[in-house]
Amino acid sequence: MVKIKMPALFRRRSGSKSPPLPQADPASGGGSPAPTPEEEMERVFRKFDANGDGRISRSELGALFESLGHAATDDELARMMAEADADGDGFISLDEFAALNATASGDAAAVEEDLRHAFRVFDADGNGTISAAELARVLHGLGEKATVQQCRRMIEGVDQNGDGLISFEEFKVMMAGGGSFAKIA
């Protein structure tokens, strides 16, 4: 999410929004219906809102990126907060968070750039593919309980060439909802 460029999550462009998160595979055994987009947005927001006060602070934002292994600089955090904090109160509310993550389609080049940033978060070793271990690392950083074996099964749902890894092209299909994959946040 950060390279340390601004993550797609907080990139605001006129006419361009981030792509939707993939839906969980009902066949994966969850048994409950997939959450609505609003429920999923609130769940992701709560991951960021570590102290549960209903708003995301700069320190909570920084802590989340650090837990993902992508510590943001003070300047990057300030820029993300400035772009996200529409009312200027120094915090990101659920409404501000939702506005930044609206799922309307946007400029294809901007979406591609956002996907590349997200892919790099998962591809820790920079080899151009996402392994089960790399997926598990990111999920753990987000507070999700997933074993490497479970991540291998998730990868099988989108691994078009059968190599046990997710390439960028496979990642794009997954993020567009064209494959089955557990939610990432």
Curated annotation (Swiss-Prot):
Report keywords, A-Z.
Answer: Calcium, Metal-binding, Repeat
> Would the keyword DNA-binding turn up in this protein's UniProt record?
no
Where does the chain bind Ca(2+) 3? 123, 125, 127, 129, 134
What residues does the EF-hand domain cover? 36-71, 72-107, 110-145, 146-181
Return the annotated region ranges for Disordered. Answer: 1-41
Fetch the PANTHER family from UniProt: EF-HAND CALCIUM-BINDING DOMAIN CONTAINING PROTEIN
The record lists the organism as Oryza sativa subsp. japonica (Rice)
Q: Name one GO molecular function term.
A: calcium ion binding
Residues where Ca(2+) 1 binds:
49, 51, 53, 55, 60
Q: Where does Ca(2+) 2 bind?
A: 85, 87, 89, 96
Protein name, per record: Probable calcium-binding protein CML10
